[in-house]
């Protein structure tokens, strides 16, 4: 089910009018001072420190896992949408660094397009939250992989990060700090204590939020949707970090992480000693975010939208309004060689992102001499069959359906033959093959949309105007960023 359809069926808050109505909420009393201390430790640009004033009006929040060099480009597109919305209403724009996430497979790879080759760095990260992984053991490998880019002042600053999540936060500050983007790392020593009261409250009734999620999941399922979140009997929405990060279960007045049992008193003591060891699961994280931040708007991707849609009951449980939800910008970057190729074939780059090789074949046939004439002949043949079918129907009405099936088979076989002809022609044409492979490397690397593979920092390092092109882009929908 599409995100927008789901939003309408569930009556989820969306749009700039709702964003304005959500302004003025108060965040945690110590939020501004804690954030200021965190940002000063990271030596954040003055524009970011000045942006803290916007917290008095409210916040537009987005977030992402702490990927290498900022993670895939969609990270910057989320930030751009949040910055644009915040600017419209005079609020602050915050980026939630998902430092509590321990799915290292999502963050241990860095893919770069260098000299027309997809190069990959894969770090052997331990299965720990990103905020617990020291960056020092991997710094030299990243520096060597980046080559001369590691000497860029922005990258050199980011490489000073002490943890994986700090490397990510510093990357955001280095490339988007001048726009006032405020990173927020919930495991940072200055910020983790802000969640203590929320965690204490969750421990008082540890199954209530899980039950609220399951109830909303049933509602979505009844409407024809496929809710991604579901809690097993006894499962809470809390993780406890010991030697690993494990989900807590609750039964008969006690908690267990599958290794040992804990009383509520023991967990409260752990919380008071080190509040970063108790962390919310996906079904609770946005609500905890909004208990601490004065969130008015929340920028998400399509997949995130589906799980946030299940949280209406959890927001009600905590007595706070769900923020206005916005889908992030989608964008594709065209470097000069790729821009020339799409112009040559009059190919819509988004058609290629969506359709891959088939979209290229469709564009190629428009410029191949003789192919359009052959396609026109097929269309004329189909028109003749249509006319023949009408004559047959006049003589014998029962023949209408067989003629319709005959025409459909002829059309399908004709299209398959034309596609085979195109592929055969392309197999003999080195230029066409070269252009197709180049389009794949740039727009569909690893078979995925560009925005999910390459970091936007790569484009910013290669093209000085890249950040300006992003700043000029719309804040929603689809954008094509032409560089060079």
Describe the residue ranges of each PLM region.
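A structural-propensity feature for long, helix-poor, extended segments
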Residues: 107, 111, 119-120, 333-366
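N-terminal leader/transition segments
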Residues: 1-44, 63
């Amino acid at each position: 089910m599409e995100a927008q359809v789901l939003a309408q069926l569930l009556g989820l808050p969306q749009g700039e009018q709702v964003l304005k109505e959500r302004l003025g909420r108060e965040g945690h009393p110590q939020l501004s001072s804690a954030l200021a201390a965190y940002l000063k430790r990271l030596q954040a640009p003055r524009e970011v420190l000045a942006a803290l004033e916007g917290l008095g009006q409210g916040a537009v929040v987005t977030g992402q896992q702490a990927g290498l060099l900022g993670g895939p480009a969609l990270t910057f597109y989320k930030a751009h949408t949040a910055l644009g919305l915040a600017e419209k209403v005079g609020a602050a724009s915050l980026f939630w660094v998902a430092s509590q996430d321990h799915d290292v497979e999502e963050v241990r790879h860095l893919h770069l397009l260098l000299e027309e080759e997809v190069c990959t760095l894969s770090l052997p990260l331990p299965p720990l939250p990103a905020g617990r992984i020291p960056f020092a053991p991997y710094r030299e490998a990243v520096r060597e992989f980046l080559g001369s880019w590691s000497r860029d002042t922005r990258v050199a600053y980011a490489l000073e990060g002490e943890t994986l999540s700090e490397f990510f936060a510093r990357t955001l500050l280095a490339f988007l700090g001048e726009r006032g983007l405020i990173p927020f790392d919930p495991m940072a020593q200055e910020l983790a204590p802000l969640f203590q009261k929320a965690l204490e409250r969750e421990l008082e009734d540890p199954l209530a939020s899980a039950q609220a999620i399951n109830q909303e999941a049933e509602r979505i399922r009844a409407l024809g949707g496929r809710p991604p979140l579901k809690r097993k009997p006894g499962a809470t929405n809390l993780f406890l970090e010991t030697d690993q990060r494990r989900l807590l279960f609750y039964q008969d007045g006690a908690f267990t992480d599958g290794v040992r049992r804990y009383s509520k008193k023991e967990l409260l003591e752990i919380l008071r000693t080190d509040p970063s060891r108790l962390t919310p699961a996906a079904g609770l994280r946005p609500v905890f975010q909004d208990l601490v931040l004065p969130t008015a708007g929340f920028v998400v991707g399509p997949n995130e939208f589906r799980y946030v849609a299940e949280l209406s009951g959890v927001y009600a449980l905590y007595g706070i309004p769900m923020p206005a939800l916005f889908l992030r910008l989608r964008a594709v970057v065209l470097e000069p060689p790729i821009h020339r190729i799409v112009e040559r074939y009059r190919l819509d780059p988004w058609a290629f992102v969506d359709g891959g090789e088939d979209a290229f074949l469709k564009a190629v046939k428009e410029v191949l001499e003789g192919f359009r004439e052959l396609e026109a002949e097929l269309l004329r043949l189909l028109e003749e069959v249509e006319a023949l079918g009408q004559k047959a129907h006049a003589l014998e009405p029962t023949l209408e359906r067989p003629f319709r099936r005959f025409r459909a088979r002829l059309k399908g076989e004709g299209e398959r033959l034309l596609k085979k002809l195109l592929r055969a022609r392309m197999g003999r044409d080195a230029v066409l093959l070269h252009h197709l492979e180049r389009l794949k490397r740039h727009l569909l690397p690893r078979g995925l949309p560009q925005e999910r593979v390459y970091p936007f920092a790569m484009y910013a390092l290669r093209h000085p105007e890249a950040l300006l092109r992003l700043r000029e882009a719309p804040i929603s929908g689809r954008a094509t960023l032409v560089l060079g």
